[in-house]
């Protein structure tokens, strides 16, 4: 703990001060220091260096709390996904892309609506799988093709709504190793694969 600071002009001031550091005084100083460390609003100050650190702490701290509510199917209502499930999905995708598909450190384009699989894909990139290349879902075919080539993306993760557009440009983008469709469990078929298979 830190002792309070006193301004001293000369050596006589030390004698004059005479602070008695009893156990009570020390406990009060510790409590004051703890309150200062927690900040003015009662929040503990943090010293994060990366997004991954924030992600890991949130997943651990709020594991059972809802992260997002999403309608995965028009016939059913909203389904809640917890931080714990989100963390597990991010780690599973990250491990699959890194180890099974050998995409660690590669540029991976993500194109589609901002849905739960989009969040999982993007967070997997931020947690160290590779470099995320989030792309506007409204791009016409020729612009998407040019962006894929200029970005030097090794893989594209896309939503089912972009499937036709991706199929049109796939043959014109030989540098892309994998085209990964969100919300699909299709096994590897050439360069195409479902995200749930990863």
Description of each model-found segment:
Residues 76-83, 94-142:
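Conserved AMP-binding/adenylate-forming
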Residues 1-21, 127-198:
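Structural core segment of the AMP-binding/adenylate-forming
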Residues 13-22, 45-69, 88-91:
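A short N-terminal helical cap/helix-turn-helix that marks the beginning
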Residues 44, 80-87:
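Short acidic-aromatic active-site loops that bind/stabilize oxyanions
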Residues 47-48, 90, 114, 137, ...:
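A conditional alpha-helix N-cap/helix-loop micro-motif detector
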Residues 28-37, 54-81, 100, 110, ...:
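AMP-dependent adenylate-forming
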